[in-house]
Amino acid sequence: MDTQPLIIRPRAEDVEGQPILRPLPSAKCRSVGPFVFFDHMLETVYPTGKGMNIRQHPHIGLSTLTYLFQGQIQHKDSLGSDQVVGAGDVSWMTAGSAIAHVERTPEPLWDQSFTMHGLQIWLASPKDHEQGPGHYSHHSAATLPVSDNLGVQIRMIAGSGFCLESPVPVLSPTLYAEVKMQTATTLLIPTEHEERAVYVLSGDAQLNGETIEPHALVVLPAGEEMSLFAESDVHAVVFGGAPLDGPRRINWNFVASDPVAIDEARRKWTAGEWPTVPGEVERIELPR
């Protein structure tokens, strides 16, 4: 068992012109609880006439969760969902055995300058849900539970912890919380979830007395209560959950415990044997 925090520095990526930082997956750590993929969409100002347009693409064996601090995204999928997701909302999509979706800037925002900033993560589905049906749900900011005590605000995005429980229909024990801390406040991170991590979005923080650089992901040692101290105003997320029920392979947009499922998904997407998003023609082809 690791007794020291594991520090992961993210790599910089670009998704359709949106700069991101991606600490998971990494060579040091493939997952934290059910979390197998973590993208921080950096705060980006789009000028008039510019925006995101991620064409339809497939997924299996995972749930995606989009959570924005600023901006909006329109979500459309092969189940027929069509939803504008605003700041503070949760967009939750479970892929099951096959789903396709589109993510783009809503039309009204193309006529003005706007700012995008948020997180998109993937959670691997438990083995008994990998081949299940797809599902989509939208949860407005007002439905997410919040605690505000002694200068520390916690919003439970998904799962449970800190005496809060989100309405998002997670498939395994999960912790995913947004934390805002005023200067000189402290947050105790309990041990109720076996695997936990902290990602500092902004601000100067210490974990058990050790400085955490902004944009570093810190995987916490199991079974040890940790103390997060804000040297300045801090914005962070705390996440984790129960360990995965076995290793997962990630290939492009596919996650599976069985490599055969990934091979079949690749074949079906290439052959056009995949559910499509109503009204959408353009798609992202399988990388060579």
Residue spans for each PLM region:
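Jelly-roll (double-stranded beta-helix
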Residues: 1-288
